[in-house]
């Protein structure tokens, strides 16, 4: 993994250290009634938990660009394989996490493209909350789920 200008910690006004000097973004990928979940490698922040592909945005990237770059790096997908629905923002004043909600098109075949993932699984929406979720994703899952198409 190459160093990027967005890599680094932010001491947030909420009292939590967040990864991403310029904010962060991830992709919540939908297929039928399932979402793509990433079992995070043990060596990453909150390793061993489940979440969505994502990470720090660089200074020159929009949150959509950052989420797409991270999705390509982590799960091997590109913009032509998804249809973006909308972006949901979790704002903390001086830091943000944007979740790009998108449908996986028929030509979308995610795979663990780097060592940040132990595995990927398509999980039924109603089963996600029972998983050992990344703490930030766990806090936001019900709000995200309630607004899914």
Residue positions per predicted region:
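Ordered hydrophobic segments in well-structured contexts
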Residues: 28, 36, 99-101
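A generic fold-level signal
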Residues: 19-22, 30, 44-45, 92-95, ...
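Acidic, metal-coordinating catalytic segment for phosphate/diphosphate chemistry
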Residues: 1-26
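Unchanged
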Residues: 55-149
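Conserved Nudix-box catalytic region and its N-terminal flanking loop in Nudix hydrolases
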Residues: 30-74
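Catalytic phosphate/metal-binding cores of nucleic-acid and nucleotide-processing enzymes, i.e., regions
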Residues: 17-19, 49, 65, 85
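Acidic surface patches and DE-rich sequence motifs
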Residues: 5, 31, 90
